[in-house]
A protein has these predicted regions:
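A short, conserved beta-to-alpha structural element at the edge of catalytic cores
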Residues: 150-170
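Short gly/pro/ser/thr-enriched loop/turn and capping motifs at secondary-structure boundaries
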Residues: 56, 162-165, 226-228
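Glycine/aspartate-rich loop-and-adjacent alpha/beta segment that forms the canonical ThDP
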Residues: 210-306
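Conserved thiamine diphosphate
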Residues: 118-122, 174-206, 249-275
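Single conserved hydrophobic/aromatic residue that forms the stacking wall/gate
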Residues: 1-7, 11
């Protein structure tokens, strides 16, 4: 819920519309079940790398929301010192290696991290997230090949939200399921309902057991959906309101709320208290991010390598 609230805050006029958030901003609204469900199998020492829709991922790694929002607003206290913005968030302490703006570029890097885990004999898994739009990139196939060839502890997670920017998956990808493209390299995998937290959780546990038992990579295709446009500047004219509204009927956050109420008999008042507490936390996060100082000009020259 905190992830959803923080994403919605980006939409408000006083932040993105008022120019408080600069550059691009890719929201994760609708896809929360993927990153939260994966947590069921994650080891605190595992590493995570993803593309530019990274807000939900870094929050799930336990990074303070104040640091995340301060990065969005380009402040000194941001997790990347205000220099990364929405798309380039990193936290070595939380083993989160980005936040990458180039489609598919994070995949070979994630395989490299997996190689490091194996080389150092670490009992860790490199979790590599990528979108459906990256699944036709050559470097992704090269990464699949090396991960399989070297038997690396890598879990590839495809967040198939049906659109690569404004291009539907049906117009960009021929053949069968996306995860099956990795099978030619000997990588086993499956496709899962990525709008259902419990399905995601079960698949993540299966994946971890397979990787640990066989010392080989695994791939999961998460069938999910983004409720907002590709980025804040995208009006989403390539899909109908009916399509979006139909998908909102299986909103993972609302579905989880219904499950807690009906199956786990959690009281409505308890959920309201949680939501109220999160709203207060988010107000504090917003206040902190806007009061944080801007980076010093000398930061322009730090972390620059020639």
């Amino acid at each position: 819920v905190r992830s959803r609230r923080q994403r919605q805050m980006c939409i408000r006029d006083r932040l993105y519309g008022a120019g408080k958030i600069g550059g691009f901003c890719h929201l994760y609204i609708g896809q929360e079940a993927v990153v939260i469900g994966i947590l069921s199998s994650i080891n605190s020492e595992d590493t995570v790398i993803t593309a530019y829709r990274d807000h939900g991922h870094i929050l799930a790694r336990g990074v303070d929301p104040k640091l995340v929002m301060s990065e969005l607003t380009g402040r000194k206290d941001g997790i990347s010192k205000g220099k990364g913005g929405s798309m380039h968030m990193f936290s070595k302490a939380n083993r989160f290696y980005g936040g990458h703006g180039i489609v598919g570029a994070q995949v070979p890097l994630g395989v490299g991290i997996g190689f490091a885990h194996k080389y150092r004999n670490e009992k860790k898994i490199s979790r590599v997230y990528l979108g459906d739009g990256a699944m036709s990139n050559g470097q992704v196939f090269e990464a699949f090949n090396l991960a399989s060839l070297w038997e690396l502890p890598v879990l590839f997670i495809i967040e198939n939200n049906k659109y690569g920017m404004g291009t539907s998956i049906g117009r960009s990808a021929a053949g069968g399921e996306l995860y099956e493209r990795a099978t030619v390299f000997g990588i086993k995998g499956e496709k899962v309902d990525g709008m259902n937290f419990f399905n995601v959780s079960e698949s993540a546990i299966r994946a971890r057991e397979y990787i640990e038992k066989n010392s080989k990579p695994y791939i999961i295709e998460m069938d999910t959906y983004r409720f907002r446009g590709h980025s804040m500047s995208d009006p989403g004219l390539y899909r109908t309101k009916d399509e979006v509204n139909k998908m909102k009927e299986i909103d993972p956050v609302l579905m989880m709320k219904e499950t807690l109420l009906n199956d786990y008999k959690i009281q409505e008042d308890t959920i309201k208290d949680i939501e109220s507490d999160i709203k207060k936390q988010i107000k504090d996060v917003e206040k902190f991010s806007l009061e944080s100082p801007l980076p010093d000009l000398k930061e322009l020259y730090t972390e620059v390598y020639l």
